[in-house]
A protein has these predicted regions:
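Terminal domain-initiation and capping elements
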Residues: 1-93
Length: 93
């Protein structure tokens, strides 16, 4: 008699990490050019045009969404922006 061994099926699930937004807040200290340069150095995926738009939105509306990404990356970008003396926060998107 032959014995057949069966292995239990293992269900693999991939969980999608919830998105977080990095928010840049306006300030009256840093120049517009400085903010654009800080954005470009802090968030590598941004281009010059995007950085300008984000800076102008933060300047006119008080805040602007820089990017949306997983939490760990959002924390990194926030910390980088803050290292340039900018005010940035993260919030769940």
């Amino acid at each position: 008699m032959t014995t057949i061994e069966t292995q239990p099926q293992v269900e693999q699930r991939q969980e999608v990490l919830p998105p977080w937004s990095v928010i840049l807040h306006n300030d009256d200290v840093n120049t517009m050019d400085y903010v654009v340069r800080a954005l470009l150095k802090s968030v590598p995926s941004l281009g010059q045009v995007q950085a300008n738009k984000i800076m102008l939105e933060a300047h006119t509306r008080g805040s602007a969404r820089v990017t949306t990404c997983p939490l760990e990356l959002a924390e990194l970008y926030r910390d980088r922006l803050e290292s340039f003396g900018l005010t940035a926060t993260i919030e769940q998107a």
